[in-house]
Amino acid sequence: MIIVLSPAKSLDYETPPHVKKHTIPDFVEDAAELIGGLRLLSPQQIASLMDISDQLAHLNFQRYAEWSPKFGAHNAKQAVLAFNGDVYEGFNAKTLSAADLDYAQNHVRVLSGLYGLLRPLDLLQPYRLEMGTRFANPRGKDLYAFWGERITQALNAQLKKNAVASRVLVNCASGEYFRSVKPKLLEAPVITPVFEDWKGGRYKIISFHAKRARGLMARYAVENRLDRPEQLKDFNAEGYAFDAEASNDSTYVFRRRVAE
């Protein structure tokens, strides 16, 4: 079983990592190709392309200039310890043990516009390049064209290392990022957990809570060494509970109702 997550825009390179073990991303050459194109852009062009402030554009202009195909402790940090958004607050990798992170290496993957597909302990140099960015490149009009089938092929290769009964992909990524995966070419079924909160008289997806819950679920799977999707139904962190009536074979719905 493999759980896929989206990356985060915010990054933490201030907190020292609590583990030394690290790996190098599989698609460094592809990332270098993208960086080469990004280096041709001015800060103003970056701001327009990514719809970000001038300050953020200048920061990323500098990041692209400093990016190196050589990764080390001086310029990079393990992905799940560097990402710092809602999902990663839920996953809270800095409190996972070395054994937990070793397990996550084989069962968690992060989709990335720049790096394609990351293992939790893959070293990450700071960047910003969302998967949905319409960045024209030699392979096509955007990053979906750039990555093509490569991400799906990499997931298939990892899935084949699992026992047949455990070959399932759990989609805890956003729609923007999961579009980089091609389910028809995936050699495993896909299960998508959905997290809903009660608000305004009905259950609905609230983005902040749903993102955090995806991280919580990934952590739950890692800490409990889950290898079958039905085990996810017991997830009950922070008040969520599996709703069988609202779910089906490919969508697991978890709901939470707290006092308004």
Curated annotation (Swiss-Prot):
What are the GO BP annotations of this UniProt entry? response to hydroperoxide
Checking Pfam families in the record gives: H2O2_YaaD
GO CC, sorted alphabetically, is: cytosol
Q: What's this protein's family per the entry?
A: Belongs to the UPF0246 family.
Instruction: Write down the NCBIfam families for this protein, in alphabetical order.
Output: PRK02101.1-1 (NF002541), PRK02101.1-3 (NF002542)
Protein name as catalogued = UPF0246 protein Bxeno_A1262
Its source organism is Paraburkholderia xenovorans (strain LB400)
